[in-house]
UniProtKB/Swiss-Prot annotation:
Origin species: Homo sapiens (Human)
A biological process term (GO) from this entry: tRNA modification
GO cellular component terms given for this protein: cytoplasm; nucleus
Record: residues binding S-adenosyl-L-methionine: W45, Y49, G87, D110, D136, L137, I157
Broad EC category: transferase
Listed result of changing S161A: Strongly reduced RNA (cytosine-3-)-methyltransferase activity
Pfam family, one: Methyltransf_12
UniProt-annotated binding residues for S-adenosyl-L-homocysteine: Y49, H61, E85, G87, D110, D136, L137, I157
InterPro entries, sorted: Methyltransf_12, METTL2/6/8-like, SAM-dependent_MTases_sf
Function summary: S-adenosyl-L-methionine-dependent methyltransferase that mediates N(3)-methylcytidine modification of residue 32 of the tRNA anticodon loop of tRNA(Ser), including tRNA(Ser)(UGA) and tRNA(Ser)(GCU). Interaction with SARS1/SerRS is required for N(3)-methylcytidine methylation.
Protein name per UniProt: tRNA N(3)-cytidine methyltransferase METTL6
UniProtKB keywords: Cytoplasm, Methyltransferase, Nucleus, S-adenosyl-L-methionine, Transferase, tRNA processing
Principal subcellular localisation of the protein: cytoplasm
Outcome of substituting C93S: Does not affect affinity for S-adenosyl-L-methionine
Amino acid sequence: MASLQRKGLQARILTSEEEEKLKRDQTLVSDFKQQKLEQEAQKNWDLFYKRNSTNFFKDRHWTTREFEELRSCREFEDQKLTMLEAGCGVGNCLFPLLEEDPNIFAYACDFSPRAIEYVKQNPLYDTERCKVFQCDLTKDDLLDHVPPESVDVVMLIFVLSAVHPDKMHLVLQNIYKVLKPGKSVLFRDYGLYDHAMLRFKASSKLGENFYVRQDGTRSYFFTDDFLAQLFMDTGYEEVVNEYVFRETVNKKEGLCVPRVFLQSKFLKPPKNPSPVVLGLDPKS
């Protein structure tokens, strides 16, 4: 297996067969079933972690390589960095970062209570280095666990796609409150026409670019325009917002799997300093 990666500002171009498949698969899941999926979202993710334990996702050692922000946001090399991983799963991103960088303190939360238990059972879990808690980012206030405007960087990695599109802005509003002015959200998630999107069977579609898996968990596939609008409507500024195209090639079987992700960086605007009025005595 080999992987070839490139970045771009335009969505992937479909083959004629892929276009035909998407045109055929237009039937939406019933409103009743959609409401049931929303009500049972936490239960379905908890069952996912019960089935897969900590074995489903690989540890993400690419994070610091892909997101230079984790290094560049420091003024000096051993400066302490406070981060929030919103949607940490079982710690596949969290623990490699803590292991690689001794000067990181991390807040980490997840929708699934079972995932949080797996994080706390990890041998690398250290309460001096991280605070981990269960949280539904669409309704639980992060300020109950994280001081306001105390976080240097927020990691939002393959998380927002699992949230209903109507509630995504609530997640962004929530993390906005704990992020320092002038600091960033680092985002990576599924992009439009990713291989996973094209593999969904008929009757899996919930809405535009939104699908349900057989286990009841859901996935949204982002366009750069949709994501940019979502962040900017919540008060962030766009810094980087680009597609990552990755082809996984299996020469032995003659397969080429096109993966598409969106990798982005959005900034919470810095606070404007108080205007200085010339010619006035500040004591008067």
